[in-house]
Swiss-Prot record:
UniProt keyword annotations, A-Z: Activator, DNA-binding, Ethylene signaling pathway, Nucleus, Plant defense, Transcription, Transcription regulation
Gene: ERF13
A biological process term (GO) from this entry: ethylene-activated signaling pathway
Compartments it resides in: Nucleus
Name this polypeptide is given: Ethylene-responsive transcription factor 13
Region listing for Disordered, in residue ranges: 57-91, 165-191
Length: 226
């Protein structure tokens, strides 16, 4: 059994703490194990009081010992309401995960009997949640239940929407025009001119042979004389 001196309101008092063999020490009169003096009347009075209490079945209780670090530690406050941080993997309002890993935002329009209105597909659930918040605020105003109410009206955060990829590039206007459509009239400096396609004329050389023409003319002349 051990003791420690403390000052309480200017009066010295002695505190005693429990020892596993406390009862045996008092009942067996093992004075050497007690921090009491036989010559001190006050110590003897304390000893007699403790002995009577132990004989009646009383055992001292040990108060819980707390370290200084635990005493100075502030109590943990539980976050609640809309300001509570979202846990990882938590489902946001108006956000659904696509099978391929992207996140779609949608909202029910009360003006269309609660029909779902698709708001787009996004890379992260936070972007989809912000897109839902903006649509919900436009539909319901201050009564809307939002995922991030502190971002409403802020232009600092802009959700990135995924644009669908085109399967094939769109053909240009020049590719769509055929050769016939290219041969059209155009206006140049106020005067209209018609673009005429080149024509391929195939001429038989027989009709342009000079000797043959002379032979034909002589035959026709002789025929006239006869």
């Amino acid at each position: 059994m051990s003791s420690s001196d403390s000052v309480n309101n200017g009066v010295n008092s002695r505190m005693y703490f429990r020892n596993p063999s406390f009862s045996n020490v008092i009942l067996n009169d093992n004075w050497s194990d007690l921090p009491l003096s036989v010559d001190d009347s006050q110590d003897m009075a304390i000893y007699n009081t403790l002995r009577d209490a132990v004989s009646s079945g009383w055992t001292p209780s040990v108060p819980p010992v707390t370290s200084p670090a635990e005493e100075n530690k502030p109590p943990a406050t539980k976050a609640s309401g809309s300001h509570a941080p979202r846990q990882k993997g938590m489902q946001y309002r108006g956000v659904r995960r696509r099978p391929w890993g992207k996140f779609a935002a949608e909202i029910r329009d009360p003006k269309k009997n609660g029909a779902r209105v698709w708001l787009g597909t996004y890379e992260t659930p936070e972007d989809a949640a912000v897109a839902y918040d903006r649509a919900a605020f436009q539909l319901r105003g201050s009564k809307a239940k939002l995922n991030f109410p502190h971002l409403i009206g802020s232009c600092k955060y802009e959700p990135v929407r995924i644009r669908p990829r085109r399967r094939s590039p769109e053909p240009s206007v020049s590719d769509q025009l055929t050769s016939e459509q290219k041969r059209e009239s155009h206006v140049d400096d106020g005067e209209s001119s018609l673009v005429v396609p080149e024509l391929d004329f195939t001429v038989d050389q027989f009709y342009f042979d000079g000797s043959l023409l002379m032979d034909q003319s002589e035959c026709s002349y002789s025929d006239n004389r006869i």
